[in-house]
């Protein structure tokens, strides 16, 4: 959960890495298999950030649907995936996965977002730049 993760990160005094993903996202699985398994990436994800993974295709119903206005129309967010997808579109202006954004404890981006790129060193550079901007 986004809010839960944000609160935890603030308490731990760590930046947040939000991972917008999908259960059916092939490129997301490729990133996890080829990039997240890199020793340096894994160390940063484990020790230096709070990782929040938000699935945009999660079909689990929200306890309470959320009514929003988007593009001049009322719409109801009924599932966790609906809410996560809405958050990605509205807060970060993107609708593709995988999509990674590093945030400070107030929810502001620390670095330009990162999208699909299977080069572990590029992902490390993204993470390190965000960590530097956090400190």
Predicted features by range, described:
Residues 12-16, 46-52, 95-98, 105-108:
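Loop/turn elements at helix/coil->beta-strand transitions in domains of secreted/extracellular proteins
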Residues 34-41, 71-135:
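Non-catalytic, surface beta->alpha helical segment in thiol-disulfide oxidoreductase systems
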Residues 29-31, 64, 112-114:
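Short, solvent-exposed loop/turn and secondary-structure capping segments
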Residues 1-16, 45, 89:
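A short beta-strand-turn-helix
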Residues 24-27, 59-62, 96-98, 108-110:
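Flexible loop/turn segments at secondary-structure boundaries
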Residues 21-23, 32-82:
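Thiol-based oxidoreductase modules, predominantly thioredoxin-like and allied folds used
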Residues 11-29:
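Short active-site neighborhood of thiol/selenol oxidoreductases, capturing the structured segment around
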